[in-house]
Amino acid sequence: MSHRKALLIHNGNAGNKNIEKALGAVVPVLSHHLDEVIIKQTKKKDDAYHFCRSIDDSVDTVFILGGDGTIHQCINAISALERKPAVGILPGGTCNDFSRVLGIPQNLAKAAEALMAGKKTSVDVCQMNDRYFLNFWGIGLIAETSNQINETEKALLGKISYFTSALRTVSSAASFPMTLKIDGEEIKEEAVMLLVMNGQYIGTNRIPLPDASIEDGLLDVLICRNTNLTALRELMSMEQGSIDRFTGELSYVQASRIEIETDTAKKADMDGEVYTHTPAVIQVLPQHIDMLVPANE
């Protein structure tokens, strides 16, 4: 694969020893294959976003060394660019959920080698109002759990893995009414959680949605109704299988556009970041960004 000049963005909040180890694993590999590698370290929350917004035409690839939060910032900047560089994800976070969908090795050195020897594929990006996400958007239980944890728990578990851990112990959740317009068809629902997905993993757990794909131009919409959460727990622990067994408790549909309204504004979780709320309009931007993937994907 031919690359001229790349930008490598890495999370500066990972601790000095961790940063040195991570850079030591990937920089020699990238430097061997690239004419030039510019390394930028994030220090403040929005740095990754601003680094990507200011990319010039000479940069043809952006490598993101970090977790799902850093990737989320970069994708929000790159998705709005007229000329978009290719993106390579180097999994350096707690969950690294989207990298799992792409089949990227979770070992950093192996990931760098696989991407350099790999190929490009065009993936869908989802747009929510004026923001973008790669993996998922959710309201209800997932947003409430992510928003309530303290900094120590975040550091130990990561926001989304904390959700999956809490899901194993929480006995019930309050349901809420919502009105959905799915590709123009309006339905009213009562649910404990609504997930709108592009990826297939949450907190390293694969959700076995039968038709999920990151290049089909469709959202995967999961409505979770059962307040005792048994069905949701079972679904997230299944390696494979059919969602049909949860009829009545869970509903799964695909759509290119969904509008969500709730009686009162509900906080929304996008790729592990809780900073938006309902109402929301979500649509797919088909094959919007080129990503590097291993050759066998």
UniProtKB/Swiss-Prot annotation:
Mg(2+) binds at S213, D216, L218. Its cofactor is Mg(2+). It is an enzyme of class 2 (transferase). One of its GO terms (biological process) is phospholipid biosynthetic process. InterPro entries: ATP-NAD_kinase_N (IPR017438), Diacylglycerol/lipid_kinase (IPR005218), Diacylglycerol_kinase_cat_dom (IPR001206), Lipid_Phosphate_FormReg (IPR050187), NAD/diacylglycerol_kinase_sf (IPR016064), YegS/DAGK_C (IPR045540). Binds 1 Mg(2+) ion per subunit. This ion appears to have a structural role and is required for catalytic activity. May catalyze the ATP-dependent phosphorylation of lipids other than diacylglycerol (DAG). In fact, is not able to exhibit diacylglycerol kinase activity in vitro. Its EC number is 2.7.1.-. It comes from the Bacteria. Residues 1-132 form the DAGKc domain. The active site is at E273 (proton acceptor). Belongs to the diacylglycerol/lipid kinase family. This is Putative lipid kinase BmrU. ATP binds at T42, G67, D68, G69, T70, I71, H72, Q73, T94. It holds the Pfam family YegS_C. GO terms for molecular function: ATP binding; ATP-dependent diacylglycerol kinase activity; metal ion binding.
